[in-house]
From Swiss-Prot:
It catalyses: Endonucleolytic cleavage to 5'-phosphomonoester. Belongs to the RNase HII family. Keywords: Cytoplasm, Endonuclease, Hydrolase, Manganese, Metal-binding, Nuclease. Its cofactor is Mn(2+); Mg(2+). The keyword Transcription does not apply. This is Ribonuclease HII. A divalent metal cation binds at residues 77-78, 169. Its main location: cytoplasm. InterPro entries: RNase_HII, RNase_HII/HIII, RNase_HII/HIII_dom, RNaseH-like_sf, RNaseH_sf.
Length: 260
């Protein structure tokens, strides 16, 4: 095996079957560079296997529905229930039966860069994507729970072709379609995880646009959540039309400044 260079071995490794006798010869190679190469290859292989296993776990509910004859399954999730400013955004995503999105997970577990990359991949492969947006003013008129349900219904109604079944993260969508409510659905269903990415990226982009309109509030940094920076900006500059006046922290600041 010494006649092979490290570069030769690096090219050979992906081609070796599990039972290839050359594995044992490589493991007995005394060169440190070869052993380091083997260790790196095994780590990469283990990571790929973990990603594949994770995908199979995420597809469990979808595969059960496919086996029952359901063809178009929409995952539903939202972003922006907790912030003090900006809309609540819901997304509905129908993935193809043969979809494979390695690295997909609950959007909260992903970096902004990974979310953006997955957003593009989901857009490229999805059968349909629907988005529903409910403004801060509408949230104040209803309440955040009902506003979120309305955003989800809008997202479902925007799907073309329409879904046959819904997988929803915890909530019930006000529509007549059959649906399953999954606790922590964005961590347990590929369709819901895809919807969580679409909803999160869509809302983040919206908040970055608001940051250009209201640069003094720092929306691009905190996305409307109640950070010390955000509270200080509200106290100093007041509230914008994008703030949720029905939310207690905003209401308290308004009372203190006699704006309510």
């Amino acid at each position: 095996m010494k006649r092979y260079t490290v570069k030769d071995i690096e090219a050979l490794l992906p081609k070796l079957g599990a039972d290839d006798p050359r594995w044992e010869m490589l493991r007995q190679d005394e060169r440190k560079s070869v052993q380091a190469l083997l260790a790196r290859f095994e780590r990469q292989k283990a990571r790929r296997h973990a990603i594949e296993q994770r995908w199979e776990e995420l597809m469990r509910y979808e595969r059960e529905l496919y086996a029952a004859g359901v063809r178009r399954i929409a995952g539903i999730d939202e972003a922006g229930r907790g912030p003090l400013a900006g809309p609540v955004v819901a997304a509905a995503v129908i993935l193809p039966k043969d979809a494979y999105l390695p690295g997909l997970d609950d959007s909260k577990r992903l970096t902004p860069e990974k979310r953006e990359a997955l957003f593009a991949q989901i857009e490229a492969c999805a059968v349909a994507i629907g988005i529903g947006i409910v403004s801060a003013a509408e949230i104040d008129e209803r309440n955040i729970y009902e506003a979120t349900r309305q955003a989800m219904a809008k997202a479902v109604n925007a799907l073309s072709p329409p879904p046959e079944h819904l997988l929803v993260d915890a909530m019930a969508v006000p529509c007549p379609l059959p649906q399953q409510r999954l606790i922590k659905g964005d961590a347990n269903s590929a369709s819901i995880a895809a919807a969580s990415v679409i909803a999160k990226v869509t809302r983040d982009r919206w908040m970055k646009e608001l940051d250009r309109r209201y640069p003094q509030y720092g929306f691009a940094r905190h996305m409307g959540y109640g950070t010390p920076e955000h509270f200080e900006a509200i106290r100093r500059y007041g509230v914008t039309p994008e703030h949720r006046r029905s939310f207690a922290p905003v209401r308290e600041v308004l009372k203190a400044s006699e704006q309510l």
